[in-house]
Structures are given as structure tokens and as C-alpha cells.
Amino acid sequence: MLNILPLLQKALRLSDNAKITKHPSGAVNDVYRVQDEGNDDTSSSADYAVKWLGNDTFSGVNRTHQFVLQQQLHSLDIAPRAIWLSDDETLWVEQWQPNIKVAQAKPETLANVLARIHQLPITARPLNLIERWQHYINVANLEPNDSLYLHAISLRSKVIKSEQDDNDLVLCHNDLLASHVLCRANDIPVVIDWEYSAMGNRYFDLASCCLINKLSIEESTALLQCYTTILGISFDEALAKFQLHKEIVSVTNDLWFKALGQSEAE
């Protein structure tokens, strides 16, 4: 386990009684919980989630922008409060979410959360998939004759058109695993891991959610049906757009893993 507690004690003014424990995390970042009951002469206490981002050399995520975005999301009661980001952007601290449980990967639950996110009155930076794809291609050192590279190029015009559709341009989470949805006592969920959030096409977010949660065709259809019912969108029109974005999401996912694999090999 990384020895990051001394740095956190200084940055967050923690007491000598502060304790750190490692928690399950994703493929790139390490996650810790820091708890501090304070010293004998103070009643202050703290409970933080800490992400070590130093292993991420490939994603191209603008951490400072995402930090400010999460502060806005917290003000709307849908994300933990972002507290501190180190100058080198390798350490991210946010409030730990107490007394919670992870949501079940039910299509209806995920549809409701996505519908809520997509209606938030927040404007973030655009996803800009073409630029992101090119970044992954560069990191992965894909050759112009690589089948994945050619697949991405063949979708270029459709991706550009997708991101110019104002009717479907919304704030997207873009990484909505069921484990990123935490249930609270008031039944209003809080969502974590917003690092890939951006303004994008709602159907990219929907298709991404279905892919990473490994939903079946039937479950994906149920999610889309519930989502369109909530927002009053034509299901037939939504289904056609969803099918296109399933392919776009698949290419994005493959490029991401190619870039990750190359960065780990270096």
C-alpha cells in the first residue's frame, strides 16, 4: 500500500490518529478510505475517500475540470463533495459516503439514475469522441491498417453527427456501473466516479451503461423502455439511435483497453 498518509495529514490537517485502509478499485486507480477521529483536544472528525491517480498515464482526463464539475454535482445532491486535488493531480480526495449500499444492476434502477443525470442543469466540456479516440489510438500505437483503427475511421462521420444533435446533447456520466450508484436512507442515490463525465449524446451514455454492466439484449431493451417512458421520448426513435451508439461504445471500449494495455507494457 502506498505511503500517502503523511502527505494527506499535511494537506487535510489530519491528526496523528488518522487511519487509512485500502478499498476495492478499478483497473487504473487505487482507492483508500481515510478516517480521523481527531485528537483528544478536539472533537472534529473526518471521513474521506482518497483516489491515487498516479498510475493513469493514458486516459487524458482533465482532473482539474472534473474536480470543479464534481463540486457542481455535489451542490445538486448527486455526487460526493470534492475536497482536495493535489497539485500534480495524482491524489483526489472526496467525502466518504456513510450508511450506504450499492444499487442492484436492475435496468429500471439504472434508467432512473441516467434520466436524472441527463436532466441536470449543468453544462460541462464536450466529450469530443473523435479527439478521445485519436488520443487512445496514439497511446496504443495503432497502425493505420489495424482493424480497430479502420473501424474507428469508418464511424467518424456518424460520431461527429451524433455529438452535434442538440436534442440529445446532455450531461453524461459515461461510466455508470451499478457499483457507482450508492443508495442512501432517503432513497435518493448518490453517484460516484465521474471522471469520464462530459456533455455528450444521451444514447452513448445509455449504451455505455448497458455494456459495462453486461446487460443482456432483453435487459438493455427494458432499460431503454423505462428511460424513454420517464422522459417522454419515442421508443422506436430511441431504439435506432441506441443501436448505432452500441457500436460506437464498443469501439470506444476497445480503444480504451488497447491504450491501457500499451501504457501498462511501457
Residue ranges of each PLM-predicted region?
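An alpha-helical support segment within catalytic cores of ATP-dependent transferases
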Residues: L2-S15, I122-N174, S179, R184-N186, ...
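Activation segment
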Residues: N55, N99, P189, S197-M199, ...
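Start-of-helix signal in alpha-solenoid helical-repeat scaffolds, especially tetratricopeptide repeats
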Residues: A240, L244-E247
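Active-site activation/catalytic loop segments of kinase-like enzymes and analogous catalytic loops
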Residues: Y203-I233, E247-S263
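Active-site acidic catalytic loop and adjacent metal/ATP-binding pocket
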Residues: P24-D36, D41-A49, K158-F204
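ATP-binding pocket architecture of kinase catalytic cores
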Residues: H23-P24, V28-L127, S147
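Conserved N-terminal boundary motif of the eukaryotic protein kinase catalytic domain
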Residues: L14-K22
